[in-house]
């Protein structure tokens, strides 16, 4: 084969295959640590494998979810804090699986950037692997795409794909949700992974940098506080579902807040009544509300406000379900009850949020 003195290489175009290979070497042990029954979590092949029988399922229904982290990525880039983004990526998909009563089985990620930094990217994958371990699913594959010209150097985006399973007949929401059922809230860890376009606008208005002390949490930088990883609710919720049989529905509170997400798990003729003074609003939301002069209803339709998961529970089992969730590490509060829907407003708020800080 003839060598061409002035011939171009892939590296000349901005794609470093060797950097990609270094990344694979760095992440292989992390990925391997996510192995579970049904998957050995070895990467390098053309596709990932999962054995449903080895996972113990008899008559499973598969449930799939995909999501990203939104513009929270921009804060991670500007703050130089990347590890938690990987946990966010997993949480956004596996939390959507558990609301349907499904156990997460495996996860794949897609990472795209302008110039691949193996060390920084490995930190993100470490977070993905941690999220997978904490939710009991195997990381069985992924794609790393270096795309100069489409992304600038330093910029990246990522997406996640999760598949879970539930035995036929056990999927949520149940068809027996009825007026009088209790509405329980599970505390969030922070802003989680939605609403960050508004968060960034508010930070810009405040004049603070992401390296400044967070006004609502002086022991942390603003960037570090805003980047608190999304809470994983998988193990606690699966335990409550399986041990009580009293969890009729779950709603993951993401974009759309309470207003848009809770109705997604309810029959058309039902709604919920939420007593806002019971909602434990985290300091970060109080600060965002003040700095952004955000109206209460806008806050409730944009952010989780301190509650990242809602459980619809049989009224006579509230204490039992709450005790199990608390034992599993959740902070739980009773927020209201299921009601007959009246008109187009299916989430009816009473009282007001406590936004004083």
Curated annotation (Swiss-Prot):
Keywords: ATP-binding, Cytoplasm, Ligase, Nucleotide-binding, Purine biosynthesis. Its main location: cytoplasm. Pathway: Purine metabolism; IMP biosynthesis via de novo pathway; 5-amino-1-(5-phospho-D-ribosyl)imidazole from N(2)-formyl-N(1)-(5-phospho-D-ribosyl)glycinamide: step 2/2. GO terms for cellular component: cytosol. It is an enzyme of class 6 (ligase). InterPro entries: PurM-like_C_dom (IPR010918), PurM-like_C_sf (IPR036676), PurM-like_N (IPR016188), PurM-like_N_sf (IPR036921), PurM_cligase (IPR004733). SUPFAM superfamilies: PurM C-terminal domain-like, PurM N-terminal domain-like. This is Phosphoribosylformylglycinamidine cyclo-ligase. It comes from Rhodopseudomonas palustris (strain BisB18). The gene is purM.
